[in-house]
Amino acid sequence: MRISALSAENPLLYSESCCDFRQKIWTCSVKFVPLSVFHNQMEKIHIKDKTFKPYISGEEIARAVKRVARRIEADVMDKDSSPLFVVMLNGAFMFASDLLREIGRPCEVAFMRMKSYEGTETTGTVDLLQDLHADVNGRTVIVVEDIVDTGTTMHALLQHLQRRNPKFVKIASLLFKPESLRYDLTVDYAAFEIPRDFIVGYGLDYDEEGRNLKDIYVIDN
């Protein structure tokens, strides 16, 4: 299992040169272990019929969100005075809230809701539960998502947005599973790359529970 964190040069690559061994957050062994787990006394949790173990701490999430915000500011906010952030409900609400506070510049925020998950599995079909009401025509759009897994939902969303003639669309996702991706799309800003395991917390749910957790947990098989 390997997880990558955002570096200043590339949003999808971890730079080992940025810190010495004691400061590294990620291990390069088979199992990913956030170092702060040992300090925060994070414990396993139980949600309905599943057990989840600690994966990424709230402190590590906060640092990654700041780095994503800096990249968006440099790439978009410095060049476009009126970008539109489209927040995908329900999962991205915590990531979007922290990300937009870090950006701290005037911008328009709108919300959409699509669904392709039942329990721990993607259904392969996408339902539009709440459409976008903001004007997209000729504008820079930044989609804020909790996770890009197979890409099924994101592919459907991009097709939906392109019909409204945006200037261009960028994707900012808290989590990205490159090994699971089935579509030709680019995640422009990803705080973390993770393997295919099912996770919960920080907005992500298992059967609508666990969104309120400040840390991220992975299913304990």
Residue ranges: model-predicted function:
Residues 6, 12-13, 35:
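Leucine-biased recognition of intrinsically disordered, low-complexity hydrophobic segments
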Residues 1, 18, 27, 34-221:
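PRPP-associated nucleotide enzymes
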